[in-house]
From Swiss-Prot:
Site positions per UniProt: Transition state stabilizer: 64, 67
CDD domains the record matches: KGPDC_HPS
Lineage: Bacteria, Pseudomonadati, Pseudomonadota, Gammaproteobacteria, Enterobacterales
The keyword Metal-binding belongs to this UniProt entry's keyword annotation: yes
Entry similarity comment: Belongs to the HPS/KGPDC family. KGPDC subfamily.
SUPFAM superfamilies with a match to the protein in the record: Ribulose-phoshate binding barrel
Keyword Lyase: yes
Cross-referenced InterPro entries: 3-keto-L-gulonate6Pdecase_UlaD, Aldolase_TIM, HPS/KGPDC, OMPdeCOase_dom, RibuloseP-bd_barrel
Pathway(s) per entry: Cofactor degradation; L-ascorbate degradation; D-xylulose 5-phosphate from L-ascorbate: step 2/4
Top-rank taxon: Bacteria
Subunit structure: Homodimer.
Name listed for the protein in its UniProt record: 3-keto-L-gulonate-6-phosphate decarboxylase UlaD
Induction per the UniProt record: Induced by L-ascorbate. Repressed by UlaR.
Length: 216
């Protein structure tokens, strides 16, 4: 089983704020995510600027595309994104359109599982050639005190068994990682637990050490 990658989510409102994080920890992570909040705040220039600074890193545009899949994904890929996200409630043709464009750029598409989705949809995504999904505990659910549970683990295992590369996100803390041991997680996303730590560098390194211990 290969080691899960570590992704930092830049859900900052401005580039200046995002740079405060990347200056410290860009070299400690595998993937730099231009979060939805930053995408809205700064547009695709955030993707372009971060990829220019860190060309050796995977840069994800978390656009959560809901419609106009070809147009929006092309905007992201032309800004040099490596991956883009499509929201799970989008029509299957939106996901297919985004994937078609991704292939032109040797990029990839992730389906963001935020909110309601079905296993029938999951099979449609697989049939369409989608390889990546993001299992997401929403920010609002976290705020309401919803913790990771057995239902989450069961769903993640099922998605993996279907052949998806699964990314896990949603207020992920270091102590949560053992919950996923034994599952071939593709990526773990940490946002505030790294960005807001007393030492973001040490927080990122602790995540990497724990991943190596649990999956190595």
């Amino acid at each position: 089983m290969s080691l899960p990658m570590l992704q930092v989510a830049l859900d900052n409102q401005t580039m200046d704020s995002a740079y405060e994080t990347t200056r410290l920890i860009a070299e400690e992570v595998d993937i730099i995510e231009v979060g939805t909040i930053l995408c809205v705040g700064e547009g695709v220039r955030a993707v372009r600027d971060l990829k220019a600074l860190y060309p050796h890193k995977i840069v994800l545009a978390d656009a959560k595309i809901a419609d106009a899949g070809k147009i929006l994904s092309r905007m992201c890929f032309e800004a040099n994104a490596d991956w883009v996200t499509v929201i799970c409630c989008a029509d299957i043709n939106t996901a297919k359109g985004a994937l078609d464009v991704a292939k032109e750029f040797n990029g990839d598409v992730q389906i963001e599982l935020t909110g309601y989705w079905t296993w029938e949809q999951a099979q449609q995504w697989r049939d369409a050639g989608i390889q990546q999904v993001v299992y997401h505990r929403s920010r609002d659910a976290q705020a309401a005190g919803v913790a990771w549970g057995e239902a989450d683990i069961t769903a993640i295992k099922r998605l993996s068994d279907m052949g998806f590369k699964v990314t896990v996100t949603g207020g992920l803390a270091l102590e949560d990682l053992p919950l996923f041991k034994g599952i071939p997680i593709h990526v773990f996303i940490a946002g505030r637990s790294i960005r807001d730590a007393a030492s973001p560098v040490e927080a990122a390194r602790q995540f990497k050490r724990s991943i190596a211990e649990l999956w190595g």
